[in-house]
Amino acid sequence: MAAPGENLKINGDRLWNSLMEMAKIGPAVAGGNNRQTVTDDDGEGRHLFQSWCTAAGMTMGLYQMGNMFAHREGTDADALPVYVGSHLDTQPTGGKYDGVLGVLSGLEIIRTLNDLNIQTKHQIVVTNFTNEEGTRYAPALLSSGVFVGIHTQ
């Protein structure tokens, strides 16, 4: 008998297609990306991410420092949330997967749970932290630092 979740697999093609769709926004040298924070390309990437989260039945919150938190409710409102994610902004010559893979992997987890009609006890929150690269606004990790209390607004 299979253990719970033993046969749980993401849709790799769907994740790849999402990565390639996001990579069309702010293409840069050598196949990388340039989606620096608070630029039109960053805004377009954030809008695309929000549309995918909405399509997956998640509710989107925009919080301090522009951090995006997409919520998938759990069955126990008192259970602590599980956070997964990273950032969508890039360096001027950023890699195609840097940061974005963490955000879109979290989204793919939600899509897979939805496909399999799996409810979780804990709320799952897919996060896009703003200005993680720090290219335009120092320091790097600014918004996640505010979120965890290292920096103040």
Regions inferred by a protein language model and the residue ranges of each:
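N-terminal capping segment at the start of a domain
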Residues: 2-39
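N-terminal glycine-rich anion-binding loops that anchor highly charged ligand groups
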Residues: 14-28, 45, 60, 77-82
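Alpha-helical metal-binding/catalytic segments enriched in His/Glu/Asp
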Residues: 22, 84, 93-132
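A non-catalytic alpha/beta surface segment that caps or lines the substrate-entry region
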Residues: 28-73
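Catalytic-core environment of secreted peptidases
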Residues: 56, 68-101, 106
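Short acidic, glycine/serine/threonine-rich loops at helix termini
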Residues: 95-96, 134-142
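A glycine-rich helix N-cap at a beta->alpha junction
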Residues: 124, 139, 143-153
